[in-house]
Amino acid sequence: MRLPSHHLELLSPARDAAIAREAILHGADAVYIGGPGFGARHNASNSLRDIADLVPFAHRFGAKVFVTLNTILHDDELEPAQRLITDLYQTGVDALIVQDMGVLEMDIPPIELHASTQCDIRSVEKAKFLSDAGFTQIVLARELNLNQIRDIRQATDATIEFFIHGALCVAYSGQCNISHAQTGRSANRGDCSQACRLPYTLKDDQGRVVAFDKHLLSMKDNDQTANLGALIDAGVQSFKIEGRYKDMSYVKNITAHYRQMLDAIIEDRGGLARSSAGRTEHFFIPSTDKTFHRGSTDYFVNARKDDIGAFDSPKFIGLPVGEVLKVTKEYLDVEVTEPLANGDGLNVMIKREVVGFRANTVEKTGENRYRVWPNEMPADMYKARPNAALNRNLDHNWQQALMKTSSERRIAVDIELGGWEEQLILTMTCEDGISVTHTLDGMFEVANNAEKALNSLKDGVAKLGQTIYYARDIQVNLADALFIPNSLLNQFRRETAEMLDEARLANYPRGSRKAVSVPPPVYPETHLSFLANVYNHKARAFYQRYGVELIDAAYEAHEEKGDVPVMITKHCLRFAFNLCPKQAKGSIKSWKATPMQLVNGDEVLTLKFDCRPCEMHVIGKMKNHILKMPQPGSIVASVSPDDLLKTLPKRKGS
């Protein structure tokens, strides 16, 4: 079900169901979570029971639950994946986020489908095709700018989803095979080895060192706080936070931050609304600086910049809080700009490495000065230079606040109590129009003190503290002020609120699979390389049905034995180090974009530059021992050698 054009959806990640609940309570309009398998996050799976329990919790708030099934599938996995989709549909989830087009060829229930970021949606033509082929919502590539997003929005009727916060893959999503090439762990199957976070030395075509031992493929984290209004204007409706590996504190904090930002825009502009019900009150001040990040960038949304990389370290350094004055074997003396607390996480940068520790005890020794005893003194701390900058990447007191109840989300209800001496009628109507009416029969006496009785009735029906509701308006319309025992009134109110819970679930509008356009779409290319990630016969049939004539197998099929682009990126190291021909004065021909090399130990990667689309291709080769491994996802790869031997027929006489 496509979002209404004026609705904005804040979409939060959830490693597990507990985090999903907190994301919703902190303001998420939808959450995305991994199921028992095929979820593109190797260590972030959840049982069907956990998801089934999550769904009604979300739906009472009008919030949605999306399940990721966005790995590419081996032929041996098609049947179990199809069974899982059927099971997920029965739990009531709202949509599947998928990468593998083979899913669209399966015999599955009419569940809504969203095109994953792994589909690498960068062009109008591809976006329109996916929309016409049956996808209700599409996740655009993080590398797009506002004009490109706007063009896609105008060309398609799918809901546009865009990442607004979190870790950035340096490669186009779905176009990175370096992990599989080097380790056999496929990013397209949720098991990335994070080669992009390693240190590399950059050399030019003459072998000269341009940068030594830097994290040259490690990006800063995405932060679109300043661009939310512009993204809305460009047509984005679903604002996605990255982070299905992130912990509870991270999800609470970042969800709360963007809930407040979007609510401010909705209130300021008018004509916009959040896509779920309720108001959220936070009991802490959100700060994107206080949970994990590698520095912030808005990437390419406005224009290409040369400071998008986190070259010094892929770790979370945190905020500067002072400087180190003295280091001994047991403690540090520091001067700070903010108070410290026991349990704080502190660090300094020593020779390009982050050296950190937890503060076991801090003692104030003077104005803005502390003595800090670490839990364990890092071995290299004595190397800290005089007045080295001190950073805090874990604010213990702030984290403690997040460990407690840190938000409350309630739905506004209008309450009307009417009736007469023989019957009371209680009506509760939610802010989104869902309404229930409950009656209570009896012989109720007229109260001696009318004013006191009316006030008591108003207070009684307004006590919604143990529910997800709050009373926005209360009307008591009785011919006479009646005396109702508190116990009876409380039970009457509780039963009505429970009826409202049930009505919200009963009236929840479930989406369905979008129909293929008439006439059916034609895929914009007739030849697909291994970069299309076609890994099974159903995906191949899908593309053939829509006009593709030549289809290469996915990289995981081990058919690409030579040098190929194992990573394609919008990030360009020539640009980052002012070696781009387009930066050179005069003609573009005056400075050629010759290949360069990235070196990490024995691993040597070639960089080639495609200047027309401003892309960098990282060229590498699959290691021989990986070529000999079973294809990921195949039964052979999933079964131990001993168990595999048990499946072989026994010889006669043995």
Regions found by a protein language model. Name each.
Residues 102-109:
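Short active-site loop/helix that positions an aromatic residue
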